[in-house]
């Protein structure tokens, strides 16, 4: 079986400030990795052949200054969160917080990685590689 695969990764520090719950901010993905039959748009992937895809993502958040902050993150398809990808965490003041997921979902159109605020929060992604988004087609070609 031929697989489609595409990865984006981010390697620079990004800052996010949320003032209320329900705010959405896209994670910037500035480096492309090898791909096959998947388009590369700024900060998103373009799915050319609809089908079932394995989605893997990871976001590394640097320790925050203010305790008891929470955040959600996940993958969006055509601007809407894919529910099965949403992860939620309290942000650590001493260690890196990692939000990650791996699911299989039907994809078409564009996908990206984004935060969904659960309350007020201020955070930075870690230095170096701090976010990845990979999709790989798992359904057979017809």
Q: Model-predicted segments: where are they?
A:
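Extracellular jelly-roll beta-sandwich "head" domains, especially the C-terminal globular C1q domain
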Residues: 1-142
């Amino acid at each position: 079986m031929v697989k489609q695969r595409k990865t984006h990764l981010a390697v620079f520090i990004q800052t996010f400030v949320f003032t209320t719950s329900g705010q959405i901010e896209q994670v910037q993905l500035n480096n492309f990795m090898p791909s096959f039959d998947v388009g590369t748009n700024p900060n998103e992937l373009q799915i050319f052949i609809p089908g079932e895809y394995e989605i893997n993502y990871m976001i590394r958040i640097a320790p925050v200054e203010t305790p008891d902050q929470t955040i959600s993150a996940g993958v969006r398809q055509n601007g809407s969160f894919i529910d099965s990808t949403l992860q939620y965490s309290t942000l650590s003041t001493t260690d890196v917080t990692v939000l990650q997921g791996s699911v299989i979902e039907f994809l078409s159109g564009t996908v990206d990685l984004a935060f969904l605020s659960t309350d007020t929060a201020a955070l930075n992604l870690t230095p170096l590689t701090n976010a990845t988004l990979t999709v790989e087609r798992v359904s057979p070609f017809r």
